[in-house]
Amino acid sequence: MTLERTFSIVKPNAVAKNAIGAIYARFESAGLKIVAAKMVHLTREQAEGFYAEHRERPFFDGLVTFMTSGPIMVQVLEGNDAVRRNREIMGATNPESALAGTLRADYADSLTENAVHGSDSPASAEREIAYFFSADDICPRTR
């Protein structure tokens, strides 16, 4: 097992449902520690920058509009195989395909409003973490 960090977003629809605490409890019960977190309301420019890899995709404008529609929680999760574990907790991107008990099965409203985002690889995690957090913002958990 490899101790690693991953990046996570609780999206506007899940924040609006007051699901932050319930989602954080799922991370922690799966052995992931929250080592940085903050609430932000993305500007269009920030959302376009974060999702730049999807700029040419047909869903890009809708995604940016959704991600700027309300506040989000961004967090860094740390644990053994954090990227894989978080993706298991989240469930399939399309909530109709998500297994019962996953975050998307429980909190998503649609494919676009799918409640959470999580890095898909350690390299993506590193890039996404750096987009929102400086090294000084991250508090390694020693206890």
UniProtKB/Swiss-Prot annotation:
- What does the record list as GO biological process? CTP biosynthetic process; GTP biosynthetic process; UTP biosynthetic process
- Where is the catalytic site? H117
- Show the InterPro entries listed in the entry: NDK-like_dom, NDK-like_dom_sf, Nucleoside_diP_kinase, Nucleoside_diP_kinase_AS
Question: EC number(s) per UniProt?
Answer: 2.7.4.6
Which terms are listed as keywords in the entry? Answer: ATP-binding, Cytoplasm, Kinase, Magnesium, Metal-binding, Nucleotide metabolism, Nucleotide-binding, Phosphoprotein, Transferase
Localisation per UniProt entry? Cytoplasm
Q: Where is the signal peptide?
A: none
> Quick one: where is this thing mainly located?
cytoplasm
Q: Where are the transmembrane segments?
A: none
In this chain, ATP is annotated as bound at K11, F59, R87, T93, R104, N114
Q: What is the superkingdom listed in this entry's lineage?
A: Bacteria
Kind of enzyme, top EC level? transferase
Which cofactor is essential here?
A: Mg(2+)
State the PROSITE patterns in the record.
NDPK, NDPK_LIKE
Q: Which reaction does it catalyse?
A: a 2'-deoxyribonucleoside 5'-diphosphate + ATP = a 2'-deoxyribonucleoside 5'-triphosphate + ADP; a ribonucleoside 5'-diphosphate + ATP = a ribonucleoside 5'-triphosphate + ADP
Entry GO CC: cytoplasm
Among the GO molecular function terms of this UniProt record, one is: metal ion binding
| Subunit composition and interactions | Homotetramer.
Family, similarity comment: Belongs to the NDK family.
- Function of the protein: Major role in the synthesis of nucleoside triphosphates other than ATP. The ATP gamma phosphate is transferred to the NDP beta phosphate via a ping-pong mechanism, using a phosphorylated active-site intermediate.
The protein's name in its UniProt record = Nucleoside diphosphate kinase
What is the source species?
Edwardsiella ictaluri (strain 93-146)
Supply the source organism's classification: Bacteria, Pseudomonadati, Pseudomonadota, Gammaproteobacteria, Enterobacterales
